[in-house]
Amino acid sequence: MLDFEKPLFEIRNKIDSLKESQEKNEVDLQDEIDMLEASLKRETTKVYTNLKPWDRVQIARLPERPTTLDYIPYIFDSFIELHGDRSFRDDPAMIGGIGYLDGKSVTVIGQQRGKDTKDNIYRNFGMAHPEGYRKALRLMKQAEKFNRPIFTFIDTKGAYPGKAAEERGQSESIAKNLMEMASLTVPVIAVVIGEGGSGGALGIGISNRVLMLENSTYSVISPEGAAALLWKDSNLAQIAAETMKITALDLLDLGIIDEVINEPLGGAQKDEEVQALSIKKMFLKHLNELKQLTPEELANDRFEKFRKIGSVVE
């Protein structure tokens, strides 16, 4: 339960208590239950339509929030995962493969968090090593060769900052991805489904279209990290989240992303199938638009999109 959900939790407890009492004591409490359920519905709508940036950060980090592998079966047909970077090893934090979207052969790449402690250790909490980014680039170049559109799912706190990752060229692998993705001649569409953290997100995020789920975040650093750097106090993370403009609506206003995908009330985890179908609908919409561009226009469109970010109006 998140802090802002406490009032809803209290109402649910009262409803459960009345239902238990009604069943146990064989008394009619249905009117009271109906009133509380109506109140819960109103309060739920009120809470989730007035979320603050820090509230959305907490939702984006929920362990039960759907991951890349949760969404893929709903969106793509006959998905086959491909492994390895052909240089060092396979990275379970970065998954990729080929499948079909509406009958069209496509390449799918995404960061993958774990579902529990054991899985998170295996997936390195969704923080990819250099070999993960090199695997992603290998699949992107393969997609370009066979003229397959590329879809990426961004869901990471950032690239793994460990000693071994740095020794194997973490910054180089991300930098190369940025360079190569900028010139790909096939459509590239990215969606931020949870946290989009720093260069770890950008390593698979240089795309013609950047979409975000309503309660996802996209930033150069976490609110805690920003607060610690700017004010020497990570406890000021809530203020940092407000200041940094990391939510989907803020980034849409700033022109950083192209579209916000609505979530079920309460977050994507409330109905992952409905959420997945919403993502699929947006994928098809933007893919149909990008199909009108030539290979050269696709590369130029992508380059210009990111070239304009951060421009200053005097």
Swiss-Prot record:
For the CoA carboxyltransferase C-terminal domain, which residue ranges apply?
32-289
Which GO terms are recorded in the biological process aspect for this UniProt protein? fatty acid biosynthetic process; malonyl-CoA biosynthetic process
The record's EC number reads 2.1.3.15
Concerning InterPro entries, the annotation shows: Acetyl_CoA_COase_a_su (IPR001095), ClpP/crotonase-like_dom_sf (IPR029045), COA_CT_C (IPR011763)
Q: Which PROSITE patterns match?
A: COA_CT_CTER
Listed Gene3D superfamilies: 2-enoyl-CoA Hydratase, Chain A, domain 1
Q: Which UniProt keywords apply?
A: ATP-binding, Cytoplasm, Fatty acid biosynthesis, Fatty acid metabolism, Lipid biosynthesis, Lipid metabolism, Nucleotide-binding, Transferase
Cellular component, GO annotation: acetyl-CoA carboxylase complex
**Catalysed reaction equations from the record:** N(6)-carboxybiotinyl-L-lysyl-[protein] + acetyl-CoA = N(6)-biotinyl-L-lysyl-[protein] + malonyl-CoA
- MF term (GO), any: ATP binding
Q: Where in the cell is it found?
A: Cytoplasm
Pathway recorded for this protein: Lipid metabolism; malonyl-CoA biosynthesis; malonyl-CoA from acetyl-CoA: step 1/1
* Paired cysteines (S-S): none
TM stretches of this protein: none
Q: Quaternary form?
A: Acetyl-CoA carboxylase is a heterohexamer composed of biotin carboxyl carrier protein (AccB), biotin carboxylase (AccC) and two subunits each of ACCase subunit alpha (AccA) and ACCase subunit beta (AccD).
Function (record text): Component of the acetyl coenzyme A carboxylase (ACC) complex. First, biotin carboxylase catalyzes the carboxylation of biotin on its carrier protein (BCCP) and then the CO(2) group is transferred by the carboxyltransferase to acetyl-CoA to form malonyl-CoA.
Q: Family, per the entry?
A: Belongs to the AccA family.
UniProt-recorded name of the protein: Acetyl-coenzyme A carboxylase carboxyl transferase subunit alpha
Question: Gene name on record?
Answer: accA
